[in-house]
A protein has these predicted regions:
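ATP-dependent adenylation/nucleotidyltransferase module used to activate substrates
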Residues: 1-196
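Local cysteine-cluster metal-coordination motifs and their immediate loop/turn environment
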Residues: 123, 204-226
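Glycine-rich nucleotide phosphate-binding loop and flanking beta-alpha elements
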Residues: 145, 228-229
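Short amphipathic alpha-helical surface patches that serve as generic macromolecular interface elements
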Residues: 157, 186-190, 199-202, 215-218, ...
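Glycine-rich phosphate/adenylate-binding loop
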Residues: 194-208
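Short microdomains enriched in Cys/His and/or Lys/Arg
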Residues: 230-247
């Protein structure tokens, strides 16, 4: 997909749009594309602190928004982390062991899954959209190349939009422009934007160290590394292990 193809799929609107920005690769590149399409004054990003292990991603989200010159709000959602801690490896303090990419291949519900996270985050963002008279909520949800969650599919987004359409006074539509793209295709869009330098302000790792370096072995890292290699560029973020980019 080229940028022009993406822009043609995005709605034309005179209202502001909201981006659900985790600080990860998908939502960050999507936010860059939204700014290029609508302008920095029309895009507002929302990030959620739900007790995720990779809390540094919120810092990365703030850095990216500063570089892009857009509004940014971090919303406290600690109760979700409290609920998910016993069963999700993705929550700080959880005793659930972090799986590797080999552990999750073919698993319909990996241990990194946070129960109903995307439903909750998107519902809150739709509420913010209605309160601020925004027309669209954009999410970087993507069907992963090697594994997937039930709440990252286009079917999931379509179902939420069907519920939201019952709102009698304010119509808000959720859009997931990357839902059918691979991460390699997303990176290609960033290359076309000539903003790969901004990817230093992203974090995909589920288990970064205290210095913010990605582990390089969790499912999210493995997929990110694989797709940067497919795109034939070096990932600018630091890793705890040596990555053979030139092989």
């Amino acid at each position: 997909m080229k940028l022009v193809d993406l822009y043609n799929k995005l709605p034309n609107t005179e209202q502001n749009v909201l981006s659900v920005l985790s600080g990860g690769l998908d939502s960050s590149i999507m936010t860059m594309c939204l700014v290029a399409k609508y302008g920095k004054d029309r895009v507002v990003a929302l990030s959620y602190d739900y007790g995720q292990k990779q809390k540094i991603e919120l810092q990365k989200a703030a850095e990216l928004c500063s570089k892009l010159g857009i509004g940014h709000k971090i919303i406290d959602l600690g109760i979700l982390g409290e609920i998910a801690e016993p069963i999700s490896a993705n929550i700080s303090g959880s005793e659930v062991e972090m799986p590797t990419i080999h552990d999750v291949l073919g698993d319909p519900q990996p241990k990194t899954y946070v129960p109903f996270r995307n439903l909750i985050l998107l519902s809150l963002t739709m509420a913010q959209a209605e309160a601020s008279n925004a027309s669209h909520v954009f999410t970087g949800l993507q069907v992963h190349d090697e594994y997937g969650y039930w709440d990252t599919t286009q079917k999931f987004v379509d179902s939420l939009n069907e519920v939201a359409s019952q709102n009698r006074t304010h119509k808000v539509e959720i859009m997931a422009p990357f839902s059918l793209l691979s991460k390699k295709q997303e990176i290609d869009l960033c290359i076309e934007l000539q903003q790969t330098n901004l990817l230093i302000h992203t974090l995909t790792c589920y288990d970064p160290d205290e210095e913010g370096r990605s582990c390089g072995i969790c499912p999210s890292c493995a997929e990110r590394i694989q797709n940067f290699m497919k795109a034939d560029i070096v990932d600018p973020i630091p890793y705890q292990i040596n990555i053979p980019w030139n092989q």
